[in-house]
Structure formats: structure tokens, C-alpha cells
Amino acid sequence: MSHNTFGHLFRVTTWGESHGPALGCVVDGCPPGLSFKLEDLQVWLDKRKPGQSRFVTQRREDDLVKVLSGVMLDADGETMTTTGTPISMLIENTDQRSKDYGEIARQYRPGHADYTYDLKYGIRDYRGGGRSSARETAARVAAGGIARLVVPGVTVRGALVQIGKHKIDRRNWDWDQVDQNPFFSPDAAIVPVWEEYLDGIRKNGSSIGAVIEVIAEGVPAGLGAPIYAKLDQDIAALLMSINAVKGVEIGNGFAAAETSGEDNADEMRMGNDGTPIFLSNHAGGILGGISTGQPVVARFAVKPTSSILTERQSIDAEGKNVDIRTKGRHDPCVGIRAVPIGEAMVACAVADHYLRDRGQTGRLK
């Protein structure tokens, strides 16, 4: 199985499976001389790790990241400085329950990658989904922690903006609220609504989809290139690579189809300091594939997890009809823990384009 690497200059390779002894990543292309502490990476993994509320999978993983290479430890015994060589990171799996998956070793769960993996490779790791499990994304979040160090002054933040048909009220948007509730919601008023709604979903053994919004502020103008190296193109590709993602939009996205040219185009004026300013940001901070200097705004939709308790029709590897009820521990809404994953993917895309722009134009922004 190839295609486990993404990026051009800031390259990330992830490895490992859901029920293996460990998983991790190798970050190649990180510039030398960047200093950080382990806690600077762990904070993002803690945001993604399972078992933190009744609304996510109850699998218990500490997700403690270990940095194995690519850094030198400073005299204080805590600060690490990148050397420019590959940074290898490892996260151990400690709470696997492979016995929950014995019955589906030869059966294809509807909505999962079981059938297509078997079809393509002739073999699949059925234990927790193996490589197709969202467990792999812990390594991406670790890589995203490194990516955040690369571009000075950039802040990447994400929030859950919709669960099922229940959307936030954007007039209530408050970033300070995001880490104060189990949903990463910027709207405190929607939290009790989501709690009641997801409790019902969870008790029925079902699942529901969601929409996540990621905003990168402080992105320098000029990142990205026309046609085949657009910044939004690469952001969309990385977000689409996340498990269960079925749609991505930048800026106004699909809503742009409902607006006129007058309403959609972001008008400009010269600011008092002699620099141009935009009067709106319908484009999501990107024009012609190149960043404008405005906040980069992306949203992505995740489908309901296919692991539900409802019995469903399928087939097995011998071509027989079977009825399947999924066992194991699963998220009733995978969108919750997708928030830090989306942040990591956007951070990696911005870091990669920052290094590519620096290499092409020679400008240090």
C-alpha cells in the first residue's frame, strides 16, 4: 500500500494501524533551528484523544507522543531544537480490543472500507479498521504540531459548526468558548441542544454527521501558485484525506452558487497605512489559488460513522448474504474529534506552501 506521504517540501509520512503496537509519523523538510517543548505537541494530541466525554468513543488512549529523531535536546532537558533532519514521532496504542472484530474478519461492514480494501489488496486488517481507522490521524495531529512552528505569526483554529441539522448561530461566535465544551463549539447556546440531540443518537446506537470550520489567520499573502499548485487545492486535498470526509469548501464555498457577482466579489480599498484592505472575505483568503493575506477559511463535512448497532445487510468474502451489527467502541459523531485533525491538515498545507514560496521567490516573509 503506497501513498502514505503528503506534502512537497514539508513532507509527512504516517505509519501504523488501529490495533498495532504503535503508530506515528516522519516529518521531512522541517527547517532547522525551530525550538519547542514536548508539551507544545501534546496539547494538540490531548485535544484529539478519545474517551474525553460521553459523546466520543470510550476507547482510552493517552496518546503520549515521543520524538525519536530530528531534534537536539537543550541544556534545560525540555527544549528541543530541530536539526533539519527527519523528525520521527511515535504514539503507542494501549487500549485495543481486537476480539470485538472477530465476527467481521470475513464480512464487509456497509459504509466501511472493508470491501474496497479486500478488492484492491486481497488482504485487510479487520481489527478496528487497520490503516483505514481514524486512529491513524493521531500521527497527523503530531505532524501538525510541528507545522505550526514553521510559519511565524500564523494561528490555525477550528470549531464544530453543525451536527446533523443543528447549526450554530454565527452571531454568537466566541473563540474562547471552543475549549469550554465537549463539542469545540464557538456558540455556547447550541451546546445543550447538541447534548440532548447526541444523547438520543447515542442511546439508539446510531450516528450522525457534522461540519467543521477551520480558520488560519496571519497567513502571508502570496502563498500558492496558479493552476496546479493552488493553496486551496492542497487544503481541500488534505481535508478530503481525513476519514469520513465527504465534502470541502473554501470561503463561501457552495453558497457562492446562490449569490451574484456583485455580492460575491471581495471589494478593495487602500488603507490609511498605504496597504490594501478587503471589504469582505467571501473568497476565504485565497484568489487564483494564492493567499491574499486575509484569514484562510475552510469547512469540511463528515458523514455519520458507519459503525452503528443497527443490523444491516451486506455480504461476506465468500459472496454470501449476511446481516451485520457492528461491535466495538465508536464515535456517535466523528465530527467532534475531527476538529483538531482539520486544524493539523490546514497547518501542514500552509507550512508546505510557505517553504515552497520561500524556495521559489527567495523572500522571507
From Swiss-Prot:
GO terms for cellular component: cytosol. CDD domains: Chorismate_synthase. NADP(+) binds at residues 48, 54. Gene3D superfamilies: Chorismate synthase AroC. Keywords: Amino-acid biosynthesis, Aromatic amino acid biosynthesis, FAD, Flavoprotein, FMN, Lyase, NADP. InterPro entries: Chorismate_synth (IPR000453), Chorismate_synth_AroC_sf (IPR035904), Chorismate_synthase_CS (IPR020541). The keyword Ion transport does not apply. Its EC number is 4.2.3.5. It comes from the Bacteria. Reduced FMN (FMNH(2)). Pathway: Metabolic intermediate biosynthesis; chorismate biosynthesis; chorismate from D-erythrose 4-phosphate and phosphoenolpyruvate: step 7/7. It catalyses: 5-O-(1-carboxyvinyl)-3-phosphoshikimate = chorismate + phosphate. FMN binds at residues 131-133, 243-244, 288, 303-307, 329. One of its GO terms (molecular function) is chorismate synthase activity. PROSITE patterns: CHORISMATE_SYNTHASE_1 (PS00787), CHORISMATE_SYNTHASE_3 (PS00789). Its cofactor is FMNH2. This reaction introduces a second double bond into the aromatic ring system. HAMAP family: Chorismate_synth. Homotetramer. Belongs to the chorismate synthase family. This is Chorismate synthase. The gene is aroC.
